[in-house]
Amino acid sequence: MKTISQMRSEPIKKDFIVDKLMKSRGVYCLVARPKVGKSLFALQLANSVANGQEFLGLKTNTSPVLYISTEMNSTQILERIDKMGLHFTDNNFFLKEQEVNERKLNLMDLQLDLQDFAYNYGGKLVIIDMLCGIRLDNGYDINSYQDIGQYVIPKFRELSNKYGFTILLIHHLNKSNTSLGSTAIDGSVDGMITLKKDNNITTKIFLNYESRDFEGLDLILKRNENLLFEISELETEDLNPNLIIFLNYAIKQRDFEFTVSEITSKLNLNITPSQFGRILNANIDNLQKEGLYIEQQRKAKARVYIAQYKEPLE
């Protein structure tokens, strides 16, 4: 047993792979629909960690990265690395790919690679692309809450604890924009990174992050000509999170009228109507750059906003 004083006297060490996103010895999941860019996102993350560079404005701790691919071969991965302008060396990036005659990679067969990566190279980040391409000895149903929550994720957590690295699992979203086995995965991993592309817009990707250890995160991203993810210009203006929620809503609605009281209540914003009104008025030009045009009209005793979304040409 420990007293509260003993607990407070113990040194607190918070190690991270990516600050505010991924802690050391954690298990995380990146999910998205096909063609959104899960593998590109993961390779960009790997490059940032391998070289100690910021990732989407977040600090990283430098570490070698092991990339386990169950879908792409080395040629395909090299094409993406070169297109994105990523810079890896023989000492900071390692690839384990699925053999041509294999249907899935057996997790037990990866033990020697994982051990070598952790002990001989000091690696702290393992990316598994994709979760469904990994075979466990007893088999499992990806849609089974019990299999995922009581067997699959605990297996990866066991490896994380044993070798002292963080694991990022890449997984699919289904047609309803929830991950296969989602409830169990959400409750079992340390954090979920979700990428979604709105059906009405091709240039913007929305990142949502939920975690046990860090604050939630909502970002609007775009991909540049080299396929690298960047924070949208709108985000670089320190945009209030409530305005991001409003923009996401506006993209879906396209044309609508509202008052600040109505929209604050409808979207359950964590802000007062008067505060949201001030933020909205201060960002009219920024919103217009993103394709959202807003006009104001005075009707009776209320100020009414008329919003129209037009997809940006760029």
Briefly describe each language-model feature range.
Residues M22, Y67, I77, D129, ...:
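Conserved RecA-like P-loop NTPase ATPase core
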Residues G85-D90, K162-Y163, L287:
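Short helix-capping segments at alpha-helix termini
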